């Protein structure tokens, strides 16, 4: 599975790189698209030691530092992985607030994918605060725009997740929520 990075900033929305069009054209019909959304405290794209250069990294020559695509078994010929990078730095409160506008940007990206790649199923994977971005994005999408959602250690209040789960997009897809005790405070409200 090829990997394309989508940069998001509050002012201009998601920036679709030129290589995305090339990667989409090279896909076989029905090949999956997998959108990876990181969580709290990842560096901005202009910072040199950005951790998501590791977690979103395609398969390396050595296997000591496996990124999400390789750990998920996403081979280069299977489909297209899109890493959605958003500003989740600063205090937890500030990053939590940034999740809402990032969700709007993610929804725009997914709507664009629905237009330019309508025959490719989309899976969203959100980790930690990235799960809030994913669930909030579902609220602005049409039915069947997403096939699967995987939430890993979601940082999203239960009430907000339940509201998002009632959206047409959420009703038309499978949602898997992998939990841990580390985020139990978010399950209360």
What function would you assign to each model-found segment?
Residues 1-26:
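A domain-start/cap signature at the N-terminus of enzymes
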Residues 2, 34, 44, 49-73, ...:
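Serine-dependent carboxylesterase/thioesterase catalytic core
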Residues 26-30, 169-170:
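Flexible, charged surface loops at secondary-structure boundaries
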Residues 31-40:
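Short beta-strand element of the alpha/beta-hydrolase
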Residues 23-28, 113-117:
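Surface-exposed acidic, glycine-flexible loop patches that form ligand/cofactor-binding
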């Amino acid at each position: 599975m090829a990997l394309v990075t989508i940069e998001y900033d509050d002012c201009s929305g998601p920036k679709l790189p030129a290589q995305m069009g090339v990667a989409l054209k090279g896909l076989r019909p029905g090949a999956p698209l997998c959108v990876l959304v990181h969580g709290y405290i990842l560096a901005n794209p202009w910072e040199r030691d950005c951790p998501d250069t590791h977690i979103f990294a395609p398969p390396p020559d050595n296997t000591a530092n496996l990124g999400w695509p390789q750990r998920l078994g996403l081979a280069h010929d299977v489909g297209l992985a899109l890493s959605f990078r958003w500003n989740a730095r600063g205090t937890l409160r500030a990053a939590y607030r940034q999740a809402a506008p990032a969700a709007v940007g993610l929804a725009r990206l997914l709507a664009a994918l629905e237009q330019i790649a309508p025959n490719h199923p989309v899976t969203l994977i959100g980790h930690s605060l990235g799960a809030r971005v994913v669930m909030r994005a579902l609220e602005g999408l049409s039915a069947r725009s997403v096939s699967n959602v995987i939430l890993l250690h979601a940082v999203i209040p239960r009430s907000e997740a339940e509201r998002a789960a009632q959206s047409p997009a959420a009703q038309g897809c499978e949602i898997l929520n992998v939990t841990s005790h580390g985020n139990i405070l978010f399950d209360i409200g």
